[in-house]
Structure formats: structure tokens, C-alpha cells
Amino acid sequence: MNYFAVALGGFFGAIAREITGRALGTSIFPVGTLAINLSGSFLLLFFMTLFLERINVSDPVRLGLTSGFLGAYTTFSTMTKEIYLLLFQSKLLIGFAYLFLSLSGGFLSGILGRALALYLVNLNFRKNGAKDEG
């Protein structure tokens, strides 16, 4: 069941990546891949935090969303290829800027996703706690 959930999530994640990449278009700077990877980092830590802190979901749901959907949605290999091509084409500043933005931005996006999830968990806890006391 877990393999099926990961495969199904991966199917939809790959489609979402293709749609998002096409919608953002192409330019000298790989905005599409950067946006996909940053949003994927945000969503991965957001959902993992919710699953660990508050929401009890089955393994197939958790794995289908995280390893499946978000694993197929984000793309480390495409980022690596794009950085290589930029450097190979002597676009050093753009290549290194993309590398820096991808790594630091992915890390910061993940932190923001986790922070939002913790905020929502605590907000929900305060609301439910206040109702129980009244």
C-alpha cells in the first residue's frame, strides 16, 4: 500500500512540477525550478511538522504526500543540471547566484513552513483549550 501511495503521489507531483515550470516560463535564470524547489521545501516541512505535532495520518497518506508528491515535485537533479549549464556557458555570476539562492532559499523556506505549521498548531491548541475551560 505504501508503494502505491508513493507512486500515486509521484504521478501527481511530476504533473504539478511540469505545469508550474511551464507557467513560470524560461529565461536565462531558472526561475521555474527555483520556485518549485523553494515551495517544495516550504511544503515538506510544513506538512511534516503538522504530521508530527498535531495531525495523525496513516503511513500511505504521509508517504504519498511527502516522498511521492513533493519528492516528484521538487527536482534536485534539474537544479544541478541548470547550474552546470550556466557555469559551462561562463555565466558564473548567475550560476553561483542560483546555487546560493537554491540552497539558502530552500533552507529558509523549510524554516518558514515549519514556523507556520507550529503557529497554526499552537493557534488551534489555544482555541480548543479556551473552549474546554469555558
From Swiss-Prot:
Na(+) binds at residues 71, 74. Na(+) is not transported, but it plays an essential structural role and its presence is essential for fluoride channel function. It comes from the Bacteria. The keyword Transport applies. One of its GO terms (biological process) is cellular detoxification of fluoride. The keyword NADP does not apply. It is a multi-pass membrane protein. The chain crosses the membrane at residues 1-21, 28-48, 68-88, 92-112. It catalyses: fluoride(in) = fluoride(out). Belongs to the fluoride channel Fluc/FEX (TC 1.A.43) family. GO terms for molecular function: fluoride channel activity; metal ion binding. InterPro entries: FluC (IPR003691). Keywords: Cell membrane, Ion channel, Ion transport, Membrane, Metal-binding, Sodium, Transmembrane, Transmembrane helix, Transport. Its main location: membrane. This is Fluoride-specific ion channel FluC 2. It is found in: Cell membrane. Fluoride-specific ion channel. Important for reducing fluoride concentration in the cell, thus reducing its toxicity. GO terms for cellular component: plasma membrane.
